[in-house]
Swiss-Prot record:
GO terms for molecular function: carbonate dehydratase activity; zinc ion binding. InterPro entries: Carbonic_anhydrase_sf, Pro_CA_2. It comes from the Bacteria. Signal peptide: none annotated. This is Uncharacterized protein RBE_0009.
Length: 164
């Protein structure tokens, strides 16, 4: 089916977007195909429909902090840098999700063995990602979320040393 398509025309659903030059937010989410619609619904609920750019890499926040695929982190940082100039972004949203294959592959399986342990692993990595972004881009706000495959989304708040 794909091989025989030379030109494809899709309907332009939002003609008014052609004139926009700014997006307030960069969403960094996982590549997982199971949550594409839910991710769009979240951004709409946050009032950010038509006001965000998106980068998708395996593991979302894990892409920034993992030690095996460090080029993913560089990609995120380079993207933030250019989008500050191109679209004047003001905030970053990391959207991790439960039952993530990248997490299963890149961190110890026992850290994901219960819902509580999985939440703790995501919280730790989301907070590491937040810290990296705040150090390199102190002018940007950083928000972190964890989505379940059931569509339930929890905001993960910044941890301070006293909280540990």
């Amino acid at each position: 089916m794909l091989a025989d398509k030379k030109i494809v025309k899709v309907e332009v659903s939002k003609e008014h977007l052609k004139t926009l030059n700014e997006a307030s937010t960069l969403l960094i989410s996982c590549v997982d195909f199971r949550l594409i619609d839910e991710t769009d619904k979240l951004m709409k609920q946050l009032g950010l429909e038509d006001d965000f750019d998106k980068v998708s890499l395996p593991g979302a926040s894990l892409a920034l902090v993992n030690e095996k695929y460090t080029h993913w982190g560089k990609t995120i940082e380079d993207t933030i840098e250019i989008l500050q100039d191109l679209h004047n972004i003001k905030q970053i949203i990391f959207l991790d999700h439960r039952e993530c294959g990248a997490y299963k592959k890149l961190i110890a399986e026992e850290r994901l063995s219960t819902k509580e342990k999985e939440t703790e692993a995501h919280t730790e990595i989301l907070n590491k990602a937040r810290k990296i972004i705040k150090e390199k881009f102190p002018q940007l706000k950083v928000y972190t979320f964890l989505m379940g495959l059931d569509g339930v989304i929890e905001q993960i708040y910044e941890r301070h040393p006293a909280d540990c």
